[in-house]
Amino acid sequence: MPAESGKRFKPSKYVPVSAAAIFLVGATTLFFAFTCPGLSLYVSPAVPIYNAIMFLFVLANFSMATFMDPGIFPRAEEDEDKEDDFRAPLYKTVEIKGIQVRMKWCATCRFYRPPRCSHCSVCDNCVEEFDHHCPWVNNCIGRRNYRYFFLFLLSLTAHIMGVFGFGLLYVLYHIEELSGVRTAVTMAVMCVAGLFFIPVAGLTGFHVVLVARGRTTNEQVTGKFRGGVNPFTNGCCNNVSRVLCSSPAPRYLGRPKKEKTIVIRPPFLRPEVSDGQITVKIMDNGIQGELRRTKSKGSLEITESQSADAEPPPPPKPDLSRYTGLRTHLGLATNEDSSLLAKDSPPTPTMYKYRPGYSSSSTSAAMPHSSSAKLSRGDSLKEPTSIAESSRHPSYRSEPSLEPESFRSPTFGKSFHFDPLSSGSRSSSLKSAQGTGFELGQLQSIRSEGTTSTSYKSLANQTRNGSLSYDSLLTPSDSPDFESVQAGPEPDPPLGYTSPFLSARLAQQREAERHPRLVPTGPTHREPSPVRYDNLSRHIVASLQEREKLLRQSPPLPGREEEPGLGDSGIQSTPGSGHAPRTSSSSDDSKRSPLGKTPLGRPAVPRFGKPDGLRGRGVGSPEPGPTAPYLGRSMSYSSQKAQPGVSETEEVALQPLLTPKDEVQLKTTYSKSNGQPKSLGSASPGPGQPPLSSPTRGGVKKVSGVGGTTYEISV
């Protein structure tokens, strides 16, 4: 019965036990009601007391045999003995007192049954020392409840004998009154007691024999030890004492408990992973920076699930609260340049798509390259000495990068890897000069608007073709002259600086307000830095050598003073109006600018008749003093002829490095000079200003180089 609580209710199982209980309780009640009062008067008052004690003992043992756990073994879990369920043999043999005893595998309970254990087909459980299943108590009789069953049989037999005997005595005393009610009820109780006495007495005798011999009903019926010796017997007295006087066996099943539903209040709930600030320490080339980002529970899960090959998720937007001065500037640049970048810019190569720029200062945070360039460009005006300090550290090349210098933060303390031939894919990239009285600390990367898409695409194409290697990407810090510059008086900020992130319309409106006419000064003496061709491919080296040869062979322009050492400087200049300045960065300028060769105290002689006050700066060159950047119009991407009186210089565009698709984009992108129409860049000088050099009226000469490449040279 204890095992039936969780199973389907079967009324037929309770019929025998209910009948036994009714007969036991009903017959005894009638005996106490009609027979015991007369026996207490005629025989002894002890007769009702004896029968009452015997009845209670019978009822107690009956209840214990019915409701007590017989010794059920718990079933194994589904995956506990999975291998044994398929591969185990049907029997295993153990030795008990020198006798081999078989243990059978139970497929239902999924374990080997211990000795004297059997699976009950009614209860559907394996019971320790299984005796039999008794329907009168509706329970299996096993090791734990066999004692109470045996005592129930003994007490019931004695009780039946007492009821029958005392009822017969009452009838003998009232033999003249057999038709009376008391005598009739007593005779009915005697019939019931006599009817149950024979089977109960027989079953009791059988179990007395089994107990004396140390056997169970199952072993006796199946004949396990019929022809041999019982290894479980300890003699008659020991067997009886073991059944009646031994301590009860342990219970293997826990008592069934109802699951309680408990309402958990918030203090006991584990807090979910909410959006919060997570600080990550980043070690890169000896620079420690704190990266504060907001990560949610979903992003953490995605990061954990991603493999090492997967592309990292895009970094979050920069925290504008830390850069209060640039809020308005960034808002305008983002809103007005988003449409231009979406149309003209190619997709960023995967190689440097998500490269945050780390700052050497503790207050700067790591951000994506576009936003980092915007913020760091503004910070470089206020903190110019951070590059000077970081440039003295050795350059680490543990992680090569193809990102242009103009997209990097000026305070980033790593050496810049740049393509020396990327200038061939730009329209006006060979503009650079140096003024007097410059300072080493103020180094800025000023690029023209529109060079972003071309430099990205040229770098991506060269990387795919395998024509460049990471070691050939030289940096300004590699030059031996970089550290030989002496600090001069601190100059004012550049007057003609226009943010490359401003739209063309805003830049055009602000140009007239920012840049007044400047008085021309003498030029600066320059000496070329050695060009490094270490790890370039053969085609590129041959193209460069042929380009140098063509430049040497071309006749000098009238009115042009050729200084020694300037033949291969890679610097070209075209005239333009003073109110339309433009500066552009070039990889050639970054490697060819001799920072320590110009005397600081004397004025320089002008080159090409170009005022020094209208000079631009390269990537690796220090910031000029009171000069303002100046830029003319390139004639490589313009279809108009130069006006009379205006000189045009030679400019070689390395067109084989670009695909036709790139050229179309370049013509569209570079039709404006820093956000201004081409007409502004090609305007003739004022009437009071003499022409800077005599014009060159030659045509365009096409020269075929090594590898089938074709160059267009303006002669």
From Swiss-Prot:
Main location: membrane
PROSITE patterns referenced in this protein's UniProt entry, alphabetically: DHHC
Catalytic activity: L-cysteinyl-[protein] + hexadecanoyl-CoA = S-hexadecanoyl-L-cysteinyl-[protein] + CoA
Topology class, membrane: Multi-pass membrane protein
Polar residues composition-biased segments: 442-478, 666-677
Catalytic machinery residues: C134 (s-palmitoyl cysteine intermediate)
Transmembrane segments: 14-34, 39-59, 149-169, 192-212
Intervals, Cytoplasmic compartment: 1-13, 60-148, 213-715
Post-translational modification, as annotated: Phosphorylation regulates association with endocytic proteins and its subcellular localization. Phosphorylation by LYN during fatty acid uptake leads to inactivation of the activity.
GO CC, alphabetical: dendrite; GABA-ergic synapse; glutamatergic synapse; Golgi membrane; membrane; nucleoplasm; phagocytic vesicle; plasma membrane
Entry-annotated residues carrying Phosphoserine: 247, 296, 299, 345, 380, 398, 406, 409, 415, 425, 429, 432, 529, 554, 621, 684, 694
Gene Ontology MF, one: protein-cysteine S-palmitoyltransferase activity
Keywords: Acyltransferase, Cell membrane, Immunity, Innate immunity, Lipid transport, Lipoprotein, Membrane, Methylation, Palmitate, Phosphoprotein, Synapse, Transferase, Transmembrane, Transmembrane helix, Transport
Ranges in the topological domain labelled Extracellular: 35-38, 170-191
Family recorded in the similarity comment: Belongs to the DHHC palmitoyltransferase family. ERF2/ZDHHC9 subfamily.
Function recorded in the entry: Palmitoyltransferase that catalyzes the addition of palmitate onto various protein substrates such as CTNND2, CD36, GSDMD, NLRP3, NOD1, NOD2, STAT3 and S1PR1 thus plays a role in various biological processes including cell adhesion, inflammation, fatty acid uptake, bacterial sensing or cardiac functions. Plays an important role in the regulation of synapse efficacy by mediating palmitoylation of delta-catenin/CTNND2, thereby increasing synaptic delivery and surface stabilization of alpha-amino-3-hydroxy-5-methyl-4-isoxazole propionic acid receptors (AMPARs).
Protein's name in the database: Palmitoyltransferase ZDHHC5
Organism: Homo sapiens (Human)
